[in-house]
Amino acid sequence: MNEEYDVIVLGTGLTECILSGIMSVNGKKVLHMDQNPYYGGESASITPLEDLYKRFKLPGQPPASMGRGRDWNVDLIPKFLMANGQLVKMLLFTEVTRYMDFKVIEGSFVYKGGKIYKVPSTEAEALASSLMGLFEKRRFRKFLVYVANFDEKDPRTFEGVDPKKTSMRDVYKKFDLGQDVIDFTGHSLALYRTDDYLDQPCCETINRIKLYSESLARYGKSPYLYPLYGLGELPQGFARLSAIYGGTYMLNKPIEEIIVQNGKVVGVKSEGEIARCKQLICDPSYVKDRVEKVGQVIRVICILSHPIKNTNDANSCQIIIPQNQVNRKSDIYVCMISFAHNVAAQGKYIAIVSTTVETKEPEKEIRPALELLEPIEQKFVSISDLFVPKDLGTDSQIFISRAYDATTHFETTCDDIKDIYKRMTGSEFDFEEMKRKKNDIYGED
């Protein structure tokens, strides 16, 4: 412990573990500590079920109907991986895929007028969908063809649109798309949580829709993947990688002090010993004075004994409740997985509802989602503060990750990882290396 390291990492959340893995691969000497006795920090998967009851201070033991406690791995933060997204690229680049198996999420659904509809995943499904009328479908198809052909580097594909200036609102107008289709596109395909994007330049939205389409094209049922045994496998996979490249790991280490001299971090004190470092990466829980609260997320873990109604008995799915449908500013999300992913006892389903808190009564805000899940066997409610670092860390060399947001995928987490990497090293995070090792990561069905 009393040694000199290039980088010390505090917390074993996904952001920290990926950065720790990448720094080790890059030849840095890394010490990685966590004050908790388990991996994953805020993004852990809790097992056995008894521990989840304790964590949420529920009295007594889980009932016998819940099956064996150790058959459960319950994610605290519900997220899926976009099949063609940045996290999958990071998994391939680092070959962490060899430690994990994935399944495709069976379907994505959208809420409209109190009912849920499947988000079409093929042209045939789109034509048969009752989400929009026939003429609307034709216009929508034209729009999707435009998006598919759009290439930032080729102005011939712009058709009079300036990707850096034209707003997304104007692009929708160009294709004469109605409000329902706009809601559906912005929230179910581009996966925006609010409507703020409408007046921004259209380039980002078009790229988001492309990511959705390309991810969907990989496996056909939905654009999402999920690891067997839960999301807690992700940080552990990257922690293994770090260890292979010489990183040192210590769990259950109380952090007494982060030592700063002349405004720069020089080490970390734990159990009376000091480990020295040039740079520090940590999550907000280790540096309360260096982060600020920018909002809250409510998450409700629901245990069910049945698949969600109107999902065709899917054993996994995502449901998006667009804000316009329930008079809110931000969308409500439901992520559902089950015993099929080795995260619950036989015949049991886990549905996690999440959204950005907007009122003094967050539990009321998510009622529309809970109604879709009835009957619910057991609920676990958490309201988490969203912390972000107060500064970039370039002066102190203390680089703080952002709290996990309410989105149902890891794209924003990956943006944070790339951003921290750039601030730490001065160079862009480079995916180019990955192309050499590109292979499919889809586990057996």
UniProtKB/Swiss-Prot annotation:
GDP-dissociation inhibitor preventing the GDP to GTP exchange of most Rab proteins. By keeping these small GTPases in their inactive GDP-bound form regulates intracellular membrane trafficking. Negatively regulates protein transport to the cilium and ciliogenesis through the inhibition of RAB8A. The modification N-acetylmethionine is found at M1. Belongs to the Rab GDI family. It is a peripheral membrane protein. GO terms for biological process: negative regulation of cilium assembly; negative regulation of protein localization to cilium; protein transport; small GTPase-mediated signal transduction; vesicle-mediated transport. Transmembrane segments: none annotated. Interacts with RHOH. Interacts with the GDP-bound inactive forms of RAB3A, RAB3B, RAB3C, RAB5A, RAB5B, RAB5C, RAB8A, RAB8B, RAB10, RAB12, RAB35, and RAB43; binds RAB3D to a lesser extent. Interacts with DZIP1; this interaction negatively regulates the interaction of GDI2 with GDP-bound RAB8A. GO terms for cellular component: cytosol; Golgi apparatus; membrane; synapse. It comes from the Eukaryota. This is Rab GDP dissociation inhibitor beta. It is found in: Cytoplasm; Membrane; Golgi apparatus, trans-Golgi network. The modification Phosphoserine is found at S130, S382. The keyword Cytoplasm applies. The keyword Phosphoprotein applies. The modification N6-succinyllysine is found at K57.
